[in-house]
Amino acid sequence: MKVRVTVMLKDGVLDPPGKAIGHALHTLGFANVGDVRAGRVIELELDETDPARAKAQADEMGRRLLANLVIESFTAEVLS
């Protein structure tokens, strides 16, 4: 079963990559772009058939390793 964990910096935490991407987009002529936040997407293939258990495992992975909960938040979703 495939799961996706998306990790983002919490609101209020400085995001230098997001600022750089936003600046580059403005330089390329995309003047209508506002704030940009950059994050990470981790897709995992789990040997699991129960979607609820796969989601629970992805949540635990996010809490224990994939996200720094002091400055980041995460979401986990089952894809298939």
Where is each model-derived feature located?
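Conserved functional loop/turn residues at catalytic and ligand-binding sites
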Residues: 29, 45, 69
